[in-house]
Amino acid sequence: MNKKTLKEEKYEHITHPFPPLYDADSKILILGSLPSVKSREQMFFYGHPQNRFWKVISAVLQEETPTTIEEKRKMLLAHHVALWDTIYSCDIIGSSDSSIKNVVPTDLRTVVEQSKIQHIYCNGRTSGKYFEKYQQKTLGMTAEVLPSTSPANAAWNF
């Protein structure tokens, strides 16, 4: 069975299917671009088994790598870390960031206003690009762009 090329696959309009993870005590906001196909199936962030996010954040927080969604939520909120994405809806082929078009950005103001966000980090260049284009000026905050934990980022290993 041959893998289809992006040109052979069809665009799908995706609207972000689940809410941000944060609470009133969140101080750090980590932004992805848009949930992958696997994340949309699981209805939670960084659901692809080869995505390195949970291993990396666990190492940074000096915690065991969580396996369930509830463990992931508890770990992040205990460390005042919020998760959300820069894209609310777009047209995309599968999980390919390079195919993204017709972007509607996420309104990040509610998360920032209802929490104590002091630092914003973008998980990868795509997230950083859309944050800078649509959200940086509105929020009056800058973000640091980190290497993507996506399995598509073969140049980076953890």
Identify the function of each model-found stretch.
Residues 2-119, 125-130, 143-154:
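A polyanion-binding, active-site-adjacent surface
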Residues 156-158:
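Post-His helix in hydrolase/transferase enzymes
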